[in-house]
Every structure is written in structure tokens, then in C-alpha cells.
Amino acid sequence: MSRTNMDTRHAHSALLAAPQSATANSRSSNSSSESSSNKNNINVGVGDDSGNVSAVSIDDGPHFRDIFHYGHEENYKLASSGITNLNSSSHAHQTLSPISISNASTPESFPEHPLGLERETEPALEAEMEAEELPPHQSKYLLSSIKATKRLKDARPFLKPVDPIALNIPHYFNYVQTPMDLSLIETKLQGNVYHSVEQVTSDFKTMVDNCLNFNGPESSISSMAKRIQKYFEKKLSAMPPRVLPASALKKTSRNRKKNEDMDSPLVIRRSVSTTNDNIGESGNREGVSGGRPKRTIHPPKSKDLFDIYENSKPKSKTLQKKFRTCLKILKVLMSKKNSDINFPFLQPVDPIALNLPNYFDVVKNPMDLGTISNNLMNWKYKTIDQFVDDLNLVFYNCFQFNPEGNEVHSMGKKLKELFNFHWLENQDILNEIETDSDLEEDNYSSSYSSDDEYDDEDINENDITNPAIQYLEQKLKKMEVELQQLKRQELSKLSKERKRKHLGKTLLRRKAMKHSVDDLKKSITDKINELSDLEMNGMIRIIKNSLPADEILTSNEDEIEIDLDILDEATIARIYERYFEKKNNNNSKRKLSGNYSTAPTNKKKKTLKFLEKDEIINNNNYSDSEEDSSDSSDSDSD
């Protein structure tokens, strides 16, 4: 069967066929001469030995009219050319070859199309298609731009295709006829589906338009879509041109050769002959290029190097100590112990998952504890004030979006109180003044070597997962509980015994005091007349101070009546200690000294006798006897 090449895009038909036999050649020439006087151009292609015409094209003057397809065992009429019944019974068993009937004035070319379309051959089409493919350097740049766009916070709703079932939006496809997302654009770029930059931007615009049509132009998701579109357009403004300059092409080819040399295996050649060397060399190169893909080497980006330099460890040891303290405080806020109040603030807020479409309308600067922890670990803060500002921003966003009385609002208040408590607790470290002496000598070495120390301090005991250690810890806890119980039991026993002893001593003391107070009263009554006037006045003053105001002592000019029963025990003891105790001690000394000397005993006997005589004297001579007794007592003391 012969081949008919047709340019389907420009609607021109052309017949290219080779004669199959000498008979076919003669028929072709005869038919072309017969139709030389005809005004119409007829191209007939026959590709079947059974007499079936595959295609016929008719050009009536300068205009293209129609293309007819003929089937088996059917009769067709061509009104413009006067050809009828091509597949009649008389020609059913004839072998027809391709026939070309053209105008005599233009035997080698087709007439010009009224729309200005020109005839093109298949090699020209292939060349044009190759020229329309996206250059590798532009494809690579677009792919990196899409990946950078996916890393934005605003790009989260556009990373994956929209799932109407999971998001409970069954009417999504009523508004969106052509779904599009960033992952699909990235996949198409990796598969070399795009042939121009405009196709990529068109898909990106389709994704943004879908968002605006479904969510409305004033929605927070729509504003996120506009922001990532602005970012992507900014990336496109720095895209390299489609055709690189000659210097860039030479540099690219040089890099490719260098990569090929690096990827090619080591070849040991034998110096047998020049022919063998060439064969072996070409064979090895073909094997390497066809065996495995070449690895592309990507140079590090200047931005990454800038980040490494910018986020280096601070020189000041005091500042490092402050940041470690901040990290410890942050770990307390993020610990499982406080999970009942910290879980809404651990990760960035997802408005889609939490069904909060107006979140970014209220919160302009989102912040969370996880981001703050990452910034601390990577030394992104230069001062502790930046850390405090970000932490206060978390609480501010919470109070701004959640009204007072909301559960999340109360959680934020409790978490802020906890932070303030630990912050005040570590004021000694946080208020240390930085000096020049605590600067590290070599910043470059310290920024890498001291990271290990920082990591060691961050190790927590909760990270230990050894079962033997965990078993021993549990056993120690049980033993500590048992030890505390035993201590409590022993202390209760000791306290009971001590109370019992103290109670017995108290009862004995009370009994002894009862007897001793009676003895004191008796001794005071017996020796009250032995006091001098000065001592008597002091004793009366003590008694008056101890009595209440309404109690008045009954007194005459010469005598004062005192009832000792109305005095308390403390007053009686005080009177006795001040005025009568010394006298009793002196009397006891006299008794002891009387055992060894005879003179005092004689005096004592005389005194006693004198006192006995004085007792017989009547009341009228009482004062004289008192003076005599006082004189006798003075002589005894001498």
C-alpha cells in the first residue's frame, strides 16, 4: 500500500507514490495527459490492489474543496470532475496504481491557499516541533521556581489536588472545570510536557483562577493565591532567555565534558595497535553513555552559604548562656507536662484543616512555639529580646483571634503566666552583662566545634529508652515509697511515746507544784513579820500589780490584811524568791553550822527562848518584843 503524506494543519493534500509496475506508470502518464485541458486539479491515491481508492483531493481553481474517503464495494460520484463509478464491476478485478491529475500550468506545485498557508513536508514539521520544545536551562529554572513556591507558607492549600470528599465540598467541580495544583505543574515539568514558558504560566494562572472562582476574591485563601502568584512572577522575571549567548553555551558544553570525564570509569588501555585502542575507547564511551544516566552536579547556592554565615553561633559566651536558658524555658512551655495548655501553640495554625477561613485576615504575622524553637536551635536570634518578641507575638495572636472566655484564650493566659514565672526565676542569668573578656577567640572554629556541647546540653533524660535502666528506675521509685511509709510509721510511734511521757511529767509537775505552793504560802505566813519596811513595801507593790483594779486591800494604820489564796501561783513564787528564799537558805546554813560549833547553838537557844518569851507577852508590848527579836536576829547574823 502506497503512502499519502498530508499536512493536516494547513489542510493541503499531496500525493507521493511510487509506481508499482510498468503498467501503472503508463496509466499514470495517460491519465495525466487526458486531464491536461481540465481546469480542476484532482489528486487520486489508490493504495489497494483490489481497486479501492483510499483518498481523492480536488482543487477547483485556486480553492480547496473537499477530501473524500472511499470504502470497499461502494459507488461514489465526483460531480466537479465528471468521474463516476470508480469501483464498478468492470474495474473490480483490475490493479489500479496511484494516479495524479494536475493542471498543466502548475504541474509541480500546488496553488496558493487563500489564507496564506504554505505547504510543508514532514521533516519541516519535525524541525519545528524540536524548536518549540522548552530548553533544558529554562525547564530547570522553572522547576526550581515551582519548588521554591511550594516551600512558602501561603502555598499549603495548593500543594496537592483538591479532594472534594475529604473537604466536604461536593459542588467543587461545578465551579472548577480544569483542576490544577503545584504538584501537577512540577510533574509536568519533570516529564518535559511543556513546550513553552507560556504554558507553565497558563497552568499557574488556571490554578489561581480556580481558587478565586470557588472562594471569591475577598477570601483569605484567594489572598494566599495572589501572593504566591506574585512570588512566582517575580521568579519568572529573572529567568534566563530561551537562547543562551555563545559564551554560556561554550561554558555549558565544557561543564558537560567535565561531568562525562568524572562519570566515566577508569579505562586501562593496551598499547598493541592504534586500531585496537580506538575501538576500545569508543566501545567504553558508548557503554558508559548507554549503561547508566549521567549525574548532574549542582553547585551550592549563594543563599545557602549566606544563611550559614548569618546563622552562625554568637561570639559572646554570656549570650550563648542566655540563649540556652531561653531554650530551657521554651522546653518547659512545650513539655508534655503542660500539654493541656500548650497544644494549640506547638505548630503553625492551618486555617483549612481547622476551618478558619478568616484567620489570616485577623492575624497578619503568624507565629508558633515550634518556629521559635527552630529559630533558637539554628541561632537565628541575635538578642534575647527577639525571642521574647516572638513569644509575645504568639500570645498576642491568640488573644486577638480568640475572644475572652474562649478556651484557647484561657490556655494562652495560663501559658503566658507560666512563661513569666520561669522568666523571673532566671533573671540572674538573663540580666548578666556581656563583656569583651567572654568573647570566643576563634569564631569560625567555635561555630562548629561548640555545637556538640550545645547538643549535649539539649539531651534530656526522657530520651533514654534502655529497658534495663527503666526497670531499675521503677524499682527505685517503689523502694522510695516503701521507705517513706516506714519512716512515717516510726515517727508516729515516737510521737505517741513522747506524748505519753510528757503527759506523765505534766501530771507529776502539777502535783509537785500543788504541794510546793502550799509550802510557799506557809513559809511566807510564818516569816512575813521578819521583813523590813522597805521589803514590805516592795511585796505590797507586787501584790497590787498582780490583783485586778477592783480588788482593794483592806488596811488599817498599822496592819494590812492579805489573803494569799486570791494570789496566783506566779505571784506567790515571785514574792518567795525575792524576799523569803534567802532567809530560808540562811536558816539552813545555821542548822548545818550548829553541828560543828557550840557558840551559835547557844545564841540560837537564847534567841528561841527569847522568841518564846516574846510569845507570852501580851498584845500591848508586841512592838517592844518585835524590836528585841529583831535585835537578837541581828546579833545572830553577826
From Swiss-Prot:
SMART domains: BROMO (SM00297). Keywords: Bromodomain, Coiled coil, Cytoplasm, DNA damage, DNA repair, Nucleus, Phosphoprotein, Repeat, Sporulation, Transcription, Transcription regulation. SUPFAM superfamilies: Bromodomain (SSF47370). Residues 468-537 form a coiled coil. Residues 271-281 have a biased composition (Polar residues). InterPro entries: Bromo_chromatin_reader, Bromodomain, Bromodomain-like_sf, Bromodomain_CS, NET_dom, NET_sf. Residues 130-239, 317-426 form the Bromo domain. GO terms for molecular function: core promoter sequence-specific DNA binding; histone binding; histone reader activity; lysine-acetylated histone binding; TFIID-class transcription factor complex binding. Residues 506-590 form the NET domain. Residues 1-10 have a biased composition (Basic and acidic residues). It is found in: Cytoplasm; Nucleus. Transcription factor involved in the expression of a broad class of genes including snRNAs. Required for sporulation and DNA-damage repair. Prevents the spreading of SIR silencing at telomeres and protects histone H4, but not H3, from deacetylation. Present with 2930 molecules/cell in log phase SD medium. This is Bromodomain-containing factor 2. It comes from Saccharomyces cerevisiae (strain ATCC 204508 / S288c).
